[in-house]
Amino acid sequence: MNGPGLGQMSLFPPEPAPEPLLCWLWLAHTLGAGSGHAGQVLDAFGGAQEAWEARESDAFRAAAGIPAAQRARLPGNTPEHYRAFARRCAARGIRILPYDDPDYPLAFSRIPDMPLVLYCTGDPRWLNEPATIGMVGSRKPTEYGQQAAAD
């Protein structure tokens, strides 16, 4: 029988790429709020999906500033873990704006370590208007603050 040997073919289809929004949520959670490494990761990889694909590399770990103690958690933390969270946000009328979204505020993109995702209600185009009002949350909330935000 002619054809490729078993070493040349895969018995399983290639794993599909995760949805871009889920990759942004994964990257934002992996780096953590206020990590100071968002700009380095985007400079090195271009976007969240590319960072996901490079997650096992030393280059990703260096750009992300992930200490050795935290490296073990990366393989189990996949973009798919954020699907239910994204659905809950959508059900509550909360829009998730990743860094590459056209409605992401231009002023935020100029911050050296910008938030990788923003959560908003209403029309996000107002965020690019000269006079805006925003609600700012803590990068290190108290337990009470976390519970209040969840409710």
Specify the residue positions occupied by each region the protein language model found.
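Short, positively charged patches
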Residues: 2-151
